[in-house]
Amino acid sequence: LEASNRLFIKLVEELHKRGMRIIIDGVFNHCGSFNKWLDRELIYESADGYEVGAFVSPKSPYRNYFLFHRTGENEWPGNGSYDGWWGHDTLPKLNYEDSKELEEYVLGIAKKWVSPPYNVDGWRLDVAADLGRSNEYNHEFWKKFRKAVKEANPHALILAEHYGDPSDWLQGDEWDSVMNYDAFMEPVTWFLTGMEKHSYEYRDDLLGN
């Protein structure tokens, strides 16, 4: 089978016939460094039909999709001073605050896949609390995201990845639920292994407790 939107539509239809639901993953905090918007790996630089990436030229239409800390003309081509998620240069952080176009594009994606003909049943949101450069913008964005999704499909689930206390996002106007590693995975790991996450040290007081 060759991957295509048509095949995906068929997959969702068959799942729904069987009483199953499908949630897709949304990574909206960052993209890959190979993404055509940045093109750090120069995959699209010489390919036909693509705009120049923001890593390659300051004149890229995607320039404001990323926050560059060095902006002199002589920093290009190859400006690696962009924000990366947790400093990872292979995961360039998206710069919504400086690009209304980017925000509108992503909100369009949010709406598209839960609408006909795709009819997906919800979103799982990667590192959702990290999106944006401020807590204020983060909440503003997810309220817009929820509005876009629920207007298109009121039954669609919005499930976000979160570490810690997610209560501020669960007030009925942003996310529906969370994958909470600190509140679930961590204690289950203690109970089953007697070890903390990312640790090789066994502790009797954790096992079975």
Where do the PLM segments sit?
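The substrate-binding groove and active-site-proximal loops of carbohydrate-active enzymes
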Residues: 1-5, 87-103, 126-137, 193-194
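Active-site-proximal helices and loops of the catalytic beta/alpha 8
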Residues: 16, 29-30, 35-72, 109, ...
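Aromatic- and acidic-residue-enriched carbohydrate-binding clefts of CAZyme catalytic domains
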Residues: 1-10, 42-95
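Short, acidic/polar
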Residues: 99-116
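Aromatic- and glycine-enriched glycan-recognition loops and surfaces
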Residues: 1-21, 100-105, 137-147, 156
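Active-site-adjacent bridging/hinge elements
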Residues: 80-84, 117-119, 209
